[in-house]
A protein has these predicted regions:
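Conserved catalytic motifs of ABC-family nucleotide-binding domains
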Residues: 161
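Conserved ABC ATPase signature
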Residues: 140-144, 148
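Catalytic Walker B motif of ABC-type/P-loop ATPase nucleotide-binding domains
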Residues: 165-168
Length: 269
């Protein structure tokens, strides 16, 4: 047993239906207080893994434990308590467009606590200050840029001082400056709060830069490699090398599994 384990994924298999398995016998341990980059090609199950950890889905097989407690979507009270300790930055922000920046960040505080509004105000301003956007508190979401929206979502994710922060493609669609700012915030917030962070990303450079360790999932939803960034960079595993080097040819095929083109066009008798 790993005493430093905060999240344990034990032989988890999951598919949205019987026709396709997304995650296949996945076992991973995410240590307390560390940043782990979860990488792999599109469709390999990275986001699905975060959703399973957050209790949004239930695994077909295997178990997930959060700080020693089983994650089970059927346990509504337990799930509510788990989400009180969890912050998630979704790929597309998931901000409420009809609310101000301030009210977006205040939302989890109003939902999960009984704090008076005067205290909520102070907490929200501190969180916005941490991401450099205290001055934007009264703006509408329609008035902010994509990079600012990502930082607002981050401020909301840390509003409850969560023990676990999960980031789903936090660098997607950002310019180089915004990407650097976001990566720096993720690393600094983790170090300052002692939280455990899971970062799903296609960006090898940023993932290796901020991650204490990294996990690589294959196109078949299996764990190909797990270790420090240096260990993955030194790996000779064909799928690891193809992903890190961005090579077009390798174990990961360009075409989604299908019948032959000749069969689909009716050319085969």
């Amino acid at each position: 047993m790993n005493d430093n384990a905060f999240i344990t994924v034990d032989r988890v298999t999951f598919g949205y239906d019987a026709s396709r398995t997304i995650l296949n016998d996945v076992s991973l341990v995410f240590p307390r207080g560390k940043v782990t980059a979860i990488m792999g090609g599109s469709g390999c199950g990275k986001t699905t893994l975060l959703r399973l950890i957050g209790g949004m889905y239930r695994a077909n097989q295997g178990t997930i434990t959060f700080d020693g407690r089983l994650v089970d979507p059927r346990d509504k009270a337990g799930l509510f308590a788990l989400r009180r300790r969890l912050g998630m930055l979704f790929q597309f922000g998931a901000l409420f467009t009809d609310l101000t920046v301030f009210d977006n960040v205040a939302f989890p505080l109003r939902e999960h606590t009984n704090l008076p509004e005067v205290m909520i105000r102070d907490v929200v301003l501190m969180k916005l200050n941490a991401v450099g956007l205290r001055g934007a508190a009264q703006l509408r979401i329609s008035q902010v840029s994509g990079g600012m929206a990502r930082r607002i979502a981050l401020a909301r994710a840390i509003a409850l001082d969560p023990d676990l922060l999960m980031y789903d493609e936090p660098f997607a669609g950002l310019d180089p400056i915004s990407m650097g700012v976001t990566a720096n915030l993720i690393r600094k917030l983790n170090d300052a709060t002692g939280a455990t962070s899971l970062v799903v990303s296609h960006d090898v450079q940023e993932g290796f830069l901020i991650g204490d360790s990294a996990s690589l999932l294959s196109s078949q939803g299996r764990v190909v490699a797990h270790g420090t960034p240096a260990e993955l960079q030194a790996s000779e595993h064909p799928e690891v090398r193809q992903f890190i080097d961005g090579a077009p040819d390798g174990p990961v095929r360009f075409h989604y599994p299908s019948r032959s083109l000749e069969e689909d066009l009716g050319l085969v008798q």
